Amino acid sequence: MYKQLEILALSVLILISIVIKAVSDENIKDQFPNSFLYSKPIEFIPNIWSAIGATGPPTYENTGHNNNLSFITSDEGVVVINAGASSSLAKALHDEIKKIINKPVILVINENGQGHAMLGNSYWIDQGVPILAHEDAIKEFEDNGPQILNRMIGYNRDKADGTRLALPTISFTDKYVVNLGNLVIEALYLGPAHSPGDISVW
């Protein structure tokens, strides 16, 4: 009886480890090969879109798209959450947004001070779009931006072309509200989290 339970428990553990390996495999092939985006933006609920990034570290193959690049569409325009890891990745996201809606991007929100959230800022600023981030995220990017940029250039090589450091143009401490007529977006700082200046957007 005990032997059978041991075999069953071992079988369950092996099955769980196989499932975990499949779900968390860092070598999942690029899901959107004709774009610098790792995956194509999907509308999860009405007006809320996200291009889900790779689950592994940033590489040349995933163009540094290892976070979620999201956007909210409205009659007033589009709000983007996360600028992308480079100018080329930001442009790839913008190209997809233009296929979905004929409205301008009116704001980009950096969810924190990490490279994949902020290094695409220069592209958006060149388009005339204001960039919002928490004050701690801006300080993180001010202090460590050159190293963050150099790391990205190291793995992204030619895909880093045109990317330069560009700080957010709007900062906030606790809460920032974006009123889009029939839609209100709140950027909230809820305290220390994954990295300096991490915020929630809802």
Name the predicted role of every residue range:
Residues 1-9:
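Bacterial N-terminal signal peptides that target proteins for export
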Residues 43-48, 75-78, 177-186:
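Beta-strand-turn-beta hairpins that frame and shape the catalytic cleft
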Residues 16-34:
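Bacterial Sec-dependent signal peptides at the C-terminal "C-region" and cleavage site
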Residues 90, 95-170, 177, 198:
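Active-site HxH/HxHxD metal-binding segment of metal-dependent hydrolases
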Residues 9-17:
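Bacterial N-terminal signal peptides
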Residues 46-96, 199-202:
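Conserved beta-strand hairpin/beta-sheet module of binuclear metal-dependent hydrolase folds
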Residues 79-83, 106-110, 186-187:
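Short catalytic-loop micro-motif centered on adjacent basic/acidic residues
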Residues 173-202:
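Core dinuclear metal-dependent hydrolase active-site scaffold
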